[in-house]
Amino acid sequence: MVQCTVTSDGPIRDCLEWIANNYACANPVTAMAERSALTSRTFARRFLAATSHRPIDYVQALRVERARALIESSGGRVDDVGFSVGYEDPTFFRRLFKRTTGLTPAAYRRKFAPIAGAHPPSVAVDGPQRVGLQ
């Protein structure tokens, strides 16, 4: 899971805030490096120092985290979920998702998506309670 990283490195902090909302863009690492006004190499070194992750690993973890949430909460096609988080190649998305979570996207949905018609544990399914009526 991607942790919210706090850093005093201004350009990296700005990039982390930007990528949180723009993770699906094409070439996000290049976009962050350009945004930071640092060379690609300097950006990568400073990003690693600030987050303990390589930029591409951070972006992929963020994308998979968002994909997990979408798979759990929507009935949309897995390929569409992959596209929505920034992957143009469905095969690559499925492989990366499985490598990250240990499950294929379809298996993840079967395991973690709520069952249709199920009630949350806090909802009474026996009908309304008659409190105070005699």
PLM regions: where:
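Basic, amphipathic alpha-helical hairpins
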Residues: 4-28, 47-51, 68-77, 97, ...
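Donor-nucleotide binding loops and adjacent catalytic segments primarily
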Residues: 14, 38, 42
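Terminal helix-turn-helix DNA-binding modules in bacterial transcription factors
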Residues: 26-30, 38, 48-89, 110-134
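Key DNA-contact positions within bacterial/archaeal DNA-binding proteins
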Residues: 41, 90-91, 106
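Short hydrophobic/aromatic patches on the structural cores and recognition surfaces of FHA
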Residues: 43, 67, 93
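Generic C-terminus detector
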Residues: 94-95, 107-112
